[in-house]
């Protein structure tokens, strides 16, 4: 959530920055905001006047009583002021709630270094990497896609449809082993080499957790709501609503909700391997073949909670942590700086890592690393105690390290051999019993 003080100080500048984001989108109901702000200022001024008058009269009451004089008239006026103050306080509370409702629908302000653009065509390539130089080396034979390569190895889309519907996949045998090996390898890299603490988290979270990281209320349609037994047809109170996690960013970042962290404990680095559940609303007809876009997929998530002065240094660092996995696996990729029109709701700046897929002859997203600055922390009331002893909002960052399913797709396509078999990347062989070919 944006700092309301920033909007009060320079609304025009904030609106100009917001308008560089994806359109059409109602970022802020400006007229409603200005009307509420005007009423708030008037009420606050009146409230301060009433409080000052009440204090003066209360002093008079004490003086009159000390002299043995009648104070009934003055006390009656104090009583009248009390009622007006209570009414003002109630209306101020209502205004603050209405302002909050407006602000939770507003995305983060793009950082000044973010390229301006209306959609993904405005994204800027930062660098690319390949084991053979910058560009991927041709396979030397016609590339099969991951579906044709994976089905003989245990990738079963028909069973996924039978069990759950479209955009679900079953993995068996060699493919299941490869999937598990990838997740374990990613966790080992992030915990042993990059200092993240491995966490096991619930796959079901409450509405407060999703509000804290920004998925609610704006993106409820992208979530899977969970119902307890016997809840069918019964209204569920907001504070009892439960959802399947769309990413472990949600539980990990919420570790610091309503907390004041000692500055000496920053940065906090957390990682978790979890399934992620997304309805993929608005993605109908896109990536219908294979594993690229699923309702359920696994991801190793990285989260950092940092000092505000060091969050952009942490963004570069985390991007490198995701790149390290791709480099160890020998997978060609490029790093893209997302433009203002392609960034996520809570991000101030985002890098996407895109892996090379030979069968598609293109790069596809495999990781997204974002600095949310204080946007989530303000919702979460996640703070640290600074050197002066004052509480200050932390900055939060999150990123994939990596999406396991898409990494599996990339391994199948980049390590395919002319006979249709798939070689095992050297880094994964210890996790697969030393096998050099997936079998």
UniProtKB/Swiss-Prot annotation:
Pfam families: Seryl_tRNA_N (PF02403), tRNA-synt_2b (PF00587)
Top EC class, one word: ligase
Assigned keywords, A-Z: Aminoacyl-tRNA synthetase, ATP-binding, Cytoplasm, Ligase, Nucleotide-binding, Protein biosynthesis
Assigned GO CC terms: cytoplasm
Pathway entry: Aminoacyl-tRNA biosynthesis; selenocysteinyl-tRNA(Sec) biosynthesis; L-seryl-tRNA(Sec) from L-serine and tRNA(Sec): step 1/1
Binding annotation for L-serine: 247-249, 301, 400
GO biological process entries: selenocysteine biosynthetic process; seryl-tRNA aminoacylation
Annotated positions binding ATP: 278-280, 365-368
Subcellular location: Cytoplasm
EC number, as in UniProt: 6.1.1.11
Protein's UniProt keywords contain Oxidoreductase: no
GO terms, molecular function: ATP binding; serine-tRNA ligase activity
Catalytic activity: tRNA(Ser) + L-serine + ATP = L-seryl-tRNA(Ser) + AMP + diphosphate + H(+); tRNA(Sec) + L-serine + ATP = L-seryl-tRNA(Sec) + AMP + diphosphate + H(+)
Job description of the protein: Catalyzes the attachment of serine to tRNA(Ser). Is also able to aminoacylate tRNA(Sec) with serine, to form the misacylated tRNA L-seryl-tRNA(Sec), which will be further converted into selenocysteinyl-tRNA(Sec).
Domain notes: Consists of two distinct domains, a catalytic core and a N-terminal extension that is involved in tRNA binding.
Protein family per UniProt: Belongs to the class-II aminoacyl-tRNA synthetase family. Type-1 seryl-tRNA synthetase subfamily.
Subunit structure, interactors included: Homodimer. The tRNA molecule binds across the dimer.
Designated name of the protein: Serine--tRNA ligase
Gene (name only): serS
